[in-house]
Design a protein with these regions (language model features):
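Coiled-coil termination/hinge junctions
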Residues: 121-154
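Short, small-residue-biased leader/transition segments that mark boundaries at the very start
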Residues: 5-9
Length: 154
């Protein structure tokens, strides 16, 4: 009977480990998806700001970089430079995708995040349950931290 109990315990240990691994794996995937979503949204924001301020910059160029024009449009030109720098940093040498492609990517990432989050919550509940069950078994078996060889380790 002790061997049957030992098998049950080993199965519970494996179940717990798998539940913990799944939770951590989903947490990582969720983090990566959120980072990609944030990156895409930032890039879209920079593209919009760039498009809005580009005509002002073109006007500045056409005015041969006149101090008077600069003084009249300082805020827009500053926004233009900031948007251009943000795009350059976010793209990191890559080609700028079309706005439609960015919108599609943001939509897909948003849906993926939603689905992942639901899986993540379930995995979290499964993990908590498995850890609690294992903890109860450990307690009943008299292993405060789930280790039989604790005394030998010291």
């Amino acid at each position: 009977s002790s061997s049957a109990a030992s098998d049950v315990y080993k199965r519970q240990e494996a179940t717990t480990e798998a539940a913990v691994d799944r939770f951590h794996s989903l947490a990582g995937e969720l983090r990566d998806t959120e980072a990609a979503l944030s990156h895409t949204s930032q890039l879209m924001g920079a593209v919009v700001k760039y498009a809005k301020t580009r005509p002002v910059f073109d006007g500045y160029k056409a005015a041969r970089y006149s101090k008077k024009y600069l003084a009249q449009h300082e805020a827009e030109l500053s926004d233009y430079r900031a948007a251009k720098a943000a795009m350059s940093e976010l793209l990191d040498g890559a080609k700028l995708p079309k706005m439609d492609a960015l919108k599609k990517r943001r939509r897909e990432l948003s849906e993926k995040k939603k689905a992942l989050y639901a899986e993540y919550r379930k995995a979290q509940a499964d993990m908590r349950e498995a850890v609690a069950v294992k903890g109860n078994i450990d307690f009943l078996r008299g292993y405060p931290d789930g280790r039989e060889d604790k005394a030998q380790e010291r």
